[in-house]
């Protein structure tokens, strides 16, 4: 949650979005880290072995829908939640993981192409570059524990630097559709 909060300000600064959520739009109001936080919660809700208390199926569905709604205003909307659950449910089957991810990403692309911008929508297929990384991943955590922290700081840091570059090149204008 803390890194989603920190990344919110870096993301909004990067793209010239108001720091106050929902001031201009409901779309792209915060970074993908918020949606990934919701995805982590969704894994907890969905995986009975991780909880010390039972949830009925209808309770899981309600909570998962709520997490998708909470993730909706972020970059990538609810799709990180859906893709994460799909990848987890198909653990060990890369073909099913990629097919499901492709279907979810295609829904996202279609919405963007029809409602906002075709080019930006099609660029989202770049996420498929993850396939080789998933293909060669052996399922074990690496030795360097600092990678997680490096990623969080790199993510917020690069957004902050891109925000400075945006201001230097274009002035204080919004550069994202929202």
Residue ranges and their predicted role:
Residues 1-178:
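Alpha-helical transmembrane segments and their immediate juxtamembrane cytosolic regions
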């Amino acid at each position: 949650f803390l890194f989603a909060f920190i990344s919110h300000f870096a993301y909004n600064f990067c793209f010239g979005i108001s720091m106050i959520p929902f001031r201009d739009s409901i779309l792209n109001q915060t970074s993908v880290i918020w949606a990934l936080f919701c995805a982590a919660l969704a894994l907890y809700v969905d995986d009975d072995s991780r909880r010390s208390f039972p949830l009925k199926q209808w309770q899981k569905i309600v909570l998962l829908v709520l997490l998708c709604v909470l993730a909706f205003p972020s970059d990538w909307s609810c799709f990180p939640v859906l893709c994460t659950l799909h990848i987890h449910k198909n653990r060990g089957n890369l073909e099913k993981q990629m097919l499901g991810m492709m279907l979810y990403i295609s829904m996202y692309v279609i919405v963007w192409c029809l409602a906002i911008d075709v080019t930006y929508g099609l660029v989202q297929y770049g996420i498929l570059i993850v396939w080789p990384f998933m293909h060669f991943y052996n399922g074990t955590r690496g030795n360097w524990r600092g990678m997680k922290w490096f990623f969080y700081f790199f993510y917020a840091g690069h957004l902050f630097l891109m925000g400075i570059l945006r201001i230097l090149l274009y002035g204080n204008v919004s550069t994202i559709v929202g």
